[in-house]
């Protein structure tokens, strides 16, 4: 049986729009994610 196509098709603009910093700062939950990652000491906060 044939397998499906590869689902990860890299695209930097889409990556930023879907997981980026400005998107995270837009909602309360997103800001919570960024602050949690800061608290944990993550080197990268968002995409």
Curated annotation (Swiss-Prot):
GO CC aspect terms: ribonucleoprotein complex; ribosome
Gene Ontology BP term (one): translation
PROSITE patterns: RIBOSOMAL_L34 (PS00784)
GO molecular function, one term: structural constituent of ribosome
Record protein name field: Large ribosomal subunit protein bL34
Record keywords, A-Z: Ribonucleoprotein, Ribosomal protein
Record has Iron as a keyword: no
Gene3D superfamilies linked: 1.10.287.3980
Extent of the signal sequence: none
Disulphide linkage map: none
Family: Belongs to the bacterial ribosomal protein bL34 family.
Pfam families attached to this UniProt entry: Ribosomal_L34
Domain of life: Bacteria
